[in-house]
Amino acid sequence: MSAAKDTKQFQYEIQEYQEDCIDNIVSIFDNLHQKEDFVEVLTAHKNKHKYNFPIQNTKNKNIDIMMETGTGKTFTFIKTIFELNKHYGYKKFIILVPSVPIREGTKTNLKDTKDYFKSVYANEREKEIETFVYEGGN
């Protein structure tokens, strides 16, 4: 007798605003490959899309992406990881979370969406996300 595997089967419906977010992020990276000036790239992107957020003139190349609660942030950033890998070959990403429950939820989402993204990106080099969890002090 073989025991049945307890697998989760989800139907994922990608929302237009999630695709817009992913496309925006990918386009910022596309422009970064063409220009050296990070602030110039972000300012042009902001003006093109008529966004209302401040651009800090800094040497650090940081992008803070925010979405409302319940909008599918985790799914969106996982898909963004695959898209950045597909378009630019990026392989290493750091995901920072503020608490243990959110970390555990993120790990669960990465596991639950594994088969979905494996099928969507079947022809890509990297089809799975390998994770390593760093906890302060270890």
Label the predicted regions.
Residues M1-N138:
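RecA-like P-loop NTPase motor core of helicase/translocase proteins
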